[in-house]
Structure formats: structure tokens, C-alpha cells
Amino acid sequence: MHGNRDFLLGQTFAKACGMTLLADPTVLVFDTQRWLLSHGDALCLEDADYQQFRTLVRSAQWQQDFLAKPLVQRQAMARELRAQSQARKASGAVYADVDRSAALHWLQACDASTLIHGHTHLPADHTLHSVGGSTHLRRVLSDWDASAQPPRLRVLRLQCTQAPQRIDLAVSGLE
């Protein structure tokens, strides 16, 4: 599933790597439950600047124009965007979180009980209650940064007949 930095990956690359690109959002049916998977950025509705940027860079025309530029220029643009993002983080700017109503709407439209997403990277579980009284869960994944101290390499493991587990691969390794 495309995220902030890999939205240019296409079907040709995915096929060459043996990957399947997932639409955002995607419903995963596992162990008799419907799980809604999303990058999560489309649900951060209060971050108007980011939504505008997202719309721009996900457009076919922008991507075609970007990929037509020389590699050196594309790398410079990517570094500049990353530097802007890091500066915003360092400034202590508050980021918009997922819009609860939009998340609940997606869950109900897909008949899913749990939304699993990243983007906000504030790992936690959030309970969502609908007007009709049904309860849904939003599970937020951490970001991945192997060079951070300590490394952030956390996953959510789904197993049949067991509750999902958050696993820190930097501590436990693959099991």
C-alpha cells in the first residue's frame, strides 16, 4: 500500500519484486473478521495542506512530470521535501490526527470491525462508537526507522484465534 514516500511505486516494480500493491483502503478477511487496512493519511482531514499535497503528488500528471525530470533533480526535490518534513517535526508542530467520523464511516461502509493504519505513527488502540451503538477499533501502527535510537521496527501480528500482538522486531527479532 502506498504511503508518503513510496507513492511512485508502480505495478511493474511490484511485479518484479513479487509484491502485490494494495488499494487504499483494502479489506482483509482473516480469521472470520473483516479488517480495514489503510495508510491513514486520507483520513487526516484537518490537515488541509497535507491533503492538498497528497492530491497533487498522487495525480497521474504530476507523477509523469516528476518522473520525466533527471534523477539528480528528483533526488534534490525529495531531499527538500524530507527536510521540510523534518523541520516541521522539530518545530513541535501538532499534526492532525485521523478524523474519527471519517474512520467510523469507512469501517461501517466496509462492514469491518477494525481499522489498521499508519501515517500518524502514534501507536495506540482507539475505540470508536457509532450512533447505533456498535463498537469499532482503530489500531495505529508505529513508523519504521532502523537508524533511530532506539530503532523503531514494530509490527502488528495477526494470528488465528489469538488477539493481535504488537511486536518490536528490534528487541525480539523475527519469531
Annotate the PLM regions.
Residues 1, 5-8, 53, 117, ...:
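Broad hydrophobic/π-residue packing in well-ordered secondary structure
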Residues 1-5, 78-83, 91, 99-105, ...:
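Generic detector of short, locally flexible boundary/turn motifs and exposed helical patches
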Residues 16-25, 34-36, 41, 47-51, ...:
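Conserved beta-sheet core of the metallophosphoesterase superfamily
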Residues 166-175:
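Short, solvent-exposed aromatic-acidic interface loops
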